[in-house]
């Protein structure tokens, strides 16, 4: 029985990155032998065990065989005679198909180290085409390693395009798409995930509402960066730069889907794109089976983001309407993710990548002022039922009116 470190631990060590977790492949063992040695079985689809002391995952070397369309259509074979090279051959990218033995000797049958040095994301074998999830994983790794200069190898992109044309991504279940999309959105350069998916043709199949934004013109005065798709990509990276939550990043991805619905005669302005985009944001969220918090914030940011950008010009009653629309008085934890998404939207424009956004500070202060209003005092005055609600709202409006407002600066009307 021989153990080998594999995959991300080997790759990240060679890149000089921190190694967060170590996975192992075991050659020449059986499940019975692993359990006899104290390993705890945890794998459902194939033999995976946890080390009795370290808790690190140890998988028996295995091969895979395609049996049907989609990522579920695989048959696995794990046995003592399966070699390390056979196990590595089933992996997606060459940089993930390296191993080290117990002495630290590198085992690299597919040129992963060369591709690391050349900053290439390249498939190991044409078996890559058997699993459409690998297109999503490729895009996710492109987002992770973009700052290191990694690019997708031409032949790998061509293979992905053929997979999409063959309908492979159409067989992906929503939960798997969401899992990879969510992980990609949390990478340092999430725009690269969307760019790779778009180049492969997969974005149009998985997120047609986002794909439709590319080529949609915007007002040059507000969006010198170009079309609505480019703005969305820039906003995603701006969200990553402020360490926004997954909920906020997903909301940024969808916040402008209404711009693809703007009538041609209105272009390049997009009046009413917030309301127009609500159904699209809700549809994407439900199709992907995104978590409720992600779904809710995506819809709310889509609907209300222009109110946030115009906050310094809004009447106090409209500011309170914004807070009510976000349901902040019952869900105050929504404020920061909402503001992060709107900040990213503001910075996702040419020349504003590091700009201040005074509207955010004003909205925080205004909401705190509103929270200082208590219904109890009005009840003690003898008000009842709807009278209490009306009095509370009026008091909140007065509180907002007392909050100092910095200079509004350049408006974003219709942006």
From Swiss-Prot:
Binding positions for CTP per the UniProt entry? 8, 11, 91, 137, 140
The record's comment on cofactor binding reads: Magnesium is required for nucleotidyltransferase activity.
- Biological process per Gene Ontology, one example term: tRNA 3'-terminal CCA addition
**Keyword terms of this UniProt record:** ATP-binding, Hydrolase, Magnesium, Metal-binding, Multifunctional enzyme, Nickel, Nucleotide-binding, Nucleotidyltransferase, RNA repair, RNA-binding, Transferase, tRNA processing
SUPFAM superfamilies membership: Nucleotidyltransferase, Poly A polymerase C-terminal region-like
Q: Kindly list the cofactors needed.
A: Mg(2+); Ni(2+)
Q: What is this protein called?
A: Multifunctional CCA protein
The HD domain covers which part of the protein?
A: 228-329
Give the record's subunit note.
Monomer. Can also form homodimers and oligomers.
EC no. given is 2.7.7.72, 3.1.3.-, 3.1.4.-
Q: Which residues bind Mg(2+)?
A: 21, 23
Source organism per UniProt: Halorhodospira halophila (strain DSM 244 / SL1)
């Amino acid at each position: 029985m021989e153990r080998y470190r594999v995959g991300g631990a080997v790759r990240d060590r060679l890149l000089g990155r921190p190694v967060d977790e170590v996975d192992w492949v075991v050659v020449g063992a059986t499940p019975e032998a692993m359990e006899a040695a104290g390993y705890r079985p945890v794998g459902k689809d194939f033999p995976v065990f946890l080390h009795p002391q370290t808790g690190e995952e140890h998988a028996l070397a295995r091969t895979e065989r395609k049996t049907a369309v989609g990522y579920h259509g695989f048959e696995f074979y794990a046995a003592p005679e399966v070699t390390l090279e056979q196990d590595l051959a089933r992996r997606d990218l060459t940089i993930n198909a390296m191993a080290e033995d117990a002495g630290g000797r590198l085992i690299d049958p597919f040129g992963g180290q060369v591709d690391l040095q050349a900053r290439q994301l390249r498939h190991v074998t044409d078996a890559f085409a058997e699993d459409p999830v690998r297109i999503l994983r490729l895009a996710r790794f492109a987002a992770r390693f973009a700052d290191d200069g990694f690019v997708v190898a031409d032949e790998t992109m061509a293979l992905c395009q053929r997979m999409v044309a063959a309908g492979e991504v159409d067989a992906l279940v929503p939960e798997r798409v969401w899992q990879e999309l969510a992980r990609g959105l949390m990478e340092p350069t999430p725009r690269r995930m969307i760019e790779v998916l778009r180049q492969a043709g997969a974005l149009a199949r998985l997120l047609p509402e986002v794909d439709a934004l590319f080529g949609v013109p915007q007002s040059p005065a507000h969006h010198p960066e170009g079309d609505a798709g480019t703005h969305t990509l820039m906003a995603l990276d701006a969200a990553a730069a402020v360490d926004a939550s997954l909920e906020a990043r997903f909301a940024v991805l969808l916040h402008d889907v209404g711009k693809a619905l703007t009538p041609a005669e209105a272009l390049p302005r997009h009046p009413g794109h917030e309301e127009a985009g609500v159904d699209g944001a809700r549809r994407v969220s439900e199709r992907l089976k995104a978590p409720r918090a992600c779904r809710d914030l995506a819809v709310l940011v889509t609907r209300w983001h222009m109110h946030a950008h115009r906050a310094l010009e809004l009447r106090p009653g409209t500011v309170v309407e914004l807070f009510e629309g976000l349901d902040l008085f019952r869900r105050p934890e929504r404020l920061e993710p909402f503001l992060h998404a709107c900040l990213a939207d503001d910075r996702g424009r040419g020349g504003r990548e590091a700009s201040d956004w005074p509207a955010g500070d004003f909205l925080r202060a205004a909401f705190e002022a509103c929270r200082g209003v208590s219904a109890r005092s009005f009840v003690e005055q003898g008000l009842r039922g709807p009278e209490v609600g009306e009095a509370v709202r009026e008091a909140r409006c007065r509180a907002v009116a007392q909050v100092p407002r910095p200079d509004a600066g350049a408006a974003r009307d219709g942006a």
